Amino acid sequence: MVKIIFVFFIFLSSFSYANDDKLYRADSRPPDEIKQSGGLMPRGQSEYFDRGTQMNINLYDHARGTQTGFVRHDDGYVSTSISLRSAHLVGQTILSGHSTYYIYVIATAPNMFNVNDVLGAYSPHPDEQEVSALGGIPYSQIYGWYRVHFGVLDEQLHRNRGYRDRYYSNLDIAPAADGYGLAGFPPEHRAWREEPWIHHAPPGCGNAPRSSMSNTCDEKTQSLGVKFLDEYQSKVKRQIFSGYQSDIDTHNRIKDEL
C-alpha cells in the first residue's frame, strides 16, 4: 500500500503545478454539460432560479459547508484549488465513486478569494488551501481540462475553445483586504473584534453599530457581497468592450493601410 501511494505522488510530481494565474477544480460533470450550464455555477444559483431562494454570499458559511460535509443548497461560491495536485487529491476523495471525472483549469479573476487569507485562524479547513469564486466561473474563464479515469490523470490538457484570454489575462484574485468585510462570521463572533476584521466589520457585526434597525450583520454582509459581485461583473464587461474596441481599431487601421 505504501508503495502504491509513493508511486501515485511520483506520478503527480511529473506535472507542472507552478502557475500563479491558474486555479483548478475537480468536477464529475463533463465539459459539454459545463458548457451548457454556462460554466461552473454555484449551487445557490440553481436554487435561486428553481425555488427563489436567495444565494448565501457568506464565505464563512461556504467554507464550513453543512454538518454532513456537503455543499450548502444556497451556496453562492464555487470552490477551486491552488494546484493540480490538490485538485486531484480532492477528486480522489469526493469523486471516488466516479470512474471518470475532470479537473478544470481556470483563469484567476477578482471575484475569487483565498479562504485562508480572508478567514485567517478561523478558516475551518486550512489544509484544503481553497480559493472560492463568488458567483461562479463562466465557461469563457475555463482554460481547459484534464480527464481523470479510474484515478489516473491524463497527461494531455484539453484546451477550451471557448476560453477568452482577453477577458482574464490581466486579472488576479482579490486581495485579502477586499474579502474581510465579506468573511461572514456570526454577529457575535470574536473575529469581528480582532485584527484585521475589526476594521472591516459591516454594521451590526461585532462592535460595529447597526446602520438601521432593519439591517442585521448577515443582511449587511449579503448586500456588500451583491455590490462586490456587481462591480466585478461591470469590470469584466468593460474589459470585454475594450477588447472588442481594440479589434475594431486594428481592423480599421489595416483597412486604411491597404
Swiss-Prot record:
Its EC number is 2.4.2.-. It is an enzyme of class 2 (transferase). One of its GO terms (biological process) is symbiont-mediated activation of host G protein-coupled receptor signal transduction. One of its GO terms (cellular component) is periplasmic space. The active site is at residue 130. GO terms for molecular function: galactose binding; glycosyltransferase activity; lipid binding; nucleotidyltransferase activity; toxin activity. InterPro entries: Enterotoxin_A. Residues 1-18 form the signal peptide. The A1 chain catalyzes the ADP-ribosylation of Gs alpha, a GTP-binding regulatory protein, to activate the adenylate cyclase. This leads to an overproduction of cAMP and eventually to a hypersecretion of chloride and bicarbonate followed by water, resulting in the characteristic cholera stool. The A2 chain tethers A1 to the pentameric ring. The four C-terminal residues of the A2 chain occupy the central pore of the holotoxin. Deletion of these residues weakens the interaction between the A subunit and the B pentamer without impairing the pentamer formation. Belongs to the enterotoxin A family. The holotoxin (choleragen) consists of a pentameric ring of B subunits whose central pore is occupied by the A subunit. The A subunit contains two chains, A1 and A2, linked by a disulfide bridge. Interaction with the host protein ARF6 causes a conformation change so that the enterotoxin subunit A1 can bind NAD and catalyze the ADP-ribosylation of the host Gs alpha. This is Cholera enterotoxin subunit A. It comes from Vibrio cholerae serotype O1 (strain ATCC 39315 / El Tor Inaba N16961). The lineage of its organism: Bacteria, Pseudomonadati, Pseudomonadota, Gammaproteobacteria, Vibrionales.
